[in-house]
Structures are given as structure tokens and as C-alpha cells.
Design a protein with these regions (language model features):
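Non-catalytic C-terminal accessory region of glycerolipid acyltransferases
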Residues: 31, 60, 100-103, 127, ...
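Catalytic core of membrane glycerolipid acyltransferases/transacylases, capturing the structured
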Residues: 106-166, 192-195, 228
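Active-site metal-coordination segments of metallo-dependent hydrolases
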Residues: 37, 142-146, 204-207
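Short glycine-/small-residue-rich flexible loop motifs, especially phosphate/cofactor-binding loops
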Residues: 40-41, 122, 153, 211, ...
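Flexible, glycine- and charge-enriched loops at secondary-structure boundaries
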Residues: 52, 163, 246-247
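A conditional alpha-helix N-cap/helix-loop micro-motif detector
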Residues: 87-91, 145, 163-167, 203-204
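Membrane-anchoring hydrophobic helices of lipid-metabolizing enzymes
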Residues: 1-112, 117, 149-154, 160
């Protein structure tokens, strides 16, 4: 399997970018055929005032951008540092006193939304020396295919970030924050545990994990996301969360995401609508805050 991955990565990085764009379009269409029913349902429930044409357009763009993100994971190990720097911009917000990372020695919890090109966020330590002065621990879900998992994990850890599977992620994230480092955790994935909260007008299961860590160590919390600007190009941004308890942070981060998805079609299409965040919304979990 690995030789096939290497060959495909070589083609993606050596041929004109039109080849990668075409592959993203084709794979996005396949994803739409597989997950289109879920995507249409999610978008229709979240935006009941939008017509079927809008749902179809946003859903298909979201699929293409999801495929684009996956292809970057495959291709990036063969990209030079110069090319990575050319494609990714660090926004001033990441280095600002108000919204950026706190000074070295102070831990931080980063709430990460599942936007297109979030894979490019792993290059942050390469792009600015200030961001490489501390350890980054990122909680993730390993891929099922061993060869693909090794390739993608190596790509994600290439510039210094350390990945921790969900099984060990809580302990390693706690340790990182306690020692003054950074823990990055997806807060908007489907979860089979957690609490129930309204998101885009419907109940869904939300994780309190990042909020629990931030509350435990009384550390700053930030939204950290990749703002897509073009194919395989983005601007990394950060925004401060102001709540200090786990419930407040969970509510605030989800409210931030809801506002972002409602802010325009481009931002809406950047989210991973193919995952069914509302799948467990009717399960007998406790309501957030109870």
C-alpha cells in the first residue's frame, strides 16, 4: 500500500495543480454519492429557509473541499518547506496578546472546528518561530488502514506537533497543558457520549473534553481554525473564548461555530457536513449543565 501512496503523492505534487483539483472534484463527487443523503438532511435542517438548489450546491462544494483536505494529507510529505510556507499564512491574531497563544510557560486549550484544510494547521510550528517554542498535542482518530495511518501521522507530525489517539488523548492533553504547552482538540465531531445541546436548531451530542481541561488548569482557551483562501491555501486564525468553566466554554465554542456557518456560503461550505453531528441528539444523554 505504501508504494501506491508514495506514487500518488508524487503525482499530486509534481503534476500541474489542475491534476490535484480534478482529483478533488472526482473524489468529492464519490463522497457526495455515498453521503449525499446525510448531507442534504443536515443542511436542510440547519437552514430550513434555503431551497433545494442551495442545499445541493453547498453540499457538493463541501464534499470537494473535504476531498481536497484529504489529498493534502497525502501530498504534503513530498512538499518542500518553501512550498508549505507559500501556501499557509499565519494571521496576526495568532500572535496577538488578546486572541493568540499565551506567553511561553502558560498552557492553552485550542478548540478546533472541522473546517476544510484543517490538516494544514499542523504546519504552524514551521511558519513562525514563536509557535515552535512549545509542545503541541493534538487529539485525533487514527485511520483504519495501517499504511495510510502511518503516512498521514508522519505528515501531521512533520513539523513538531504530537498526535495522541482518543484513547490516550485526554491524559496527554492534560499533561501538556499542565506543563505550559498546547492541547488542540476537535470540538464539533459526532460523539457517542457527552451532553445534549442545541446546534443549528436541533439537539446534538457535544463533547465537554476541551472545556474540562481548560477549567481544570484555569488556562486560556482559543478557537483555532484554517480559513481556506484557495485550493491548498489557507490563513490560520485564532480567536479568544471568554468563558472559564467547561459548560460555558462548550456553549461559547458551539455558538461561535454556529455564527460562522451562518456568516456566508463560503464559510458554510468549508465545514464537514458529511459527518452526522446530530446522529446521537436523541439519545438519553444528560442535557448540558444538568
Amino acid at each position: 500500500m505504501r508504494p501506491l501512496i508514495v506514487t500518488y503523492a508524487w503525482l499530486l505534487t509534481r503534476l500541474p495543480e489542475a491534476f490535484a483539483r480534478l482529483n478533488a472534484a472526482l473524489l468529492g463527487q464519490i463522497l457526495w454519492l455515498i453521503r449525499g443523503k446525510v448531507i442534504r438532511r443536515n443542511l436542510s435542517k440547519a437552514f430550513p429557509d434555503k431551497d433545494a438548489e442551495w442545499v445541493l450546491r453547498i453540499g457538493r462544494i463541501s464534499c470537494r473541499r473535504t476531498a481536497e483536505m484529504g489529498l493534502f494529507s497525502i501530498a504534503s510529505p513530498l512538499m518542500s518547506e518553501v512550498e508549505i510556507r507559500d501556501r499557509i499564512v499565519v494571521d496576526e491574531s495568532i500572535l496577538s496578546p488578546e486572541h493568540g497563544l499565551p506567553p511561553k510557560g502558560t498552557g492553552a486549550v485550542l478548540f478546533v472546528p472541522h473546517f476544510a484544510l484543517m490538516e494544514m494547521m499542523t504546519a504552524a510550528p514551521l511558519l513562525r518561530p514563536e509557535l515552535a517554542k512549545r509542545e503541541w498535542v493534538v487529539v485525533y482518530r487514527p485511520l483504519d488502514q495501517p499504511a495510510a495511518e502511518r503516512w498521514v501521522k508522519e505528515a501531521r507530525e512533520r513539523f513538531g506537533m504530537k498526535l495522541a489517539s482518543r484513547r490516550e488523548g485526554f491524559a496527554r492533553s492534560m499533561k501538556a497543558v499542565r506543563e505550559g504547552h498546547v492541547a488542540a482538540i476537535l470540538f464539533d465531531q459526532t460523539t457517542q457520549s457527552g451532553s445534549i445541546w442545541q446546534f443549528l436548531g436541533a439537539p446534538c451530542a457535544v463533547t465537554e473534553l476541551p472545556g474540562i481541561i481548560a477549567q481544570r488548569f484555569k488556562c486560556p482557551s482559543r478557537i483555532f481554525w484554517a480559513d481556506r483562501t484557495d485550493f491548498w491555501r489557507c490563513r490560520l486564525r485564532m480567536e479568544a473564548l471568554h468563558a472559564t468553566d467547561s459548560i460555558g466554554l462548550t456553549i461559547e465554542s458551539n455558538a461561535w461555530l454556529e455564527q460562522k456557518l451562518r456568516s456566508g456560503d463560503d464559510a458554510c461550505a468549508n465545514w464537514l457536513w458529511a459527518h452526522d453531528r446530530w446522529k446521537h441528539g436523541q439519545h438519553p444523554f444528560k442535557k448540558l449543565g444538568e
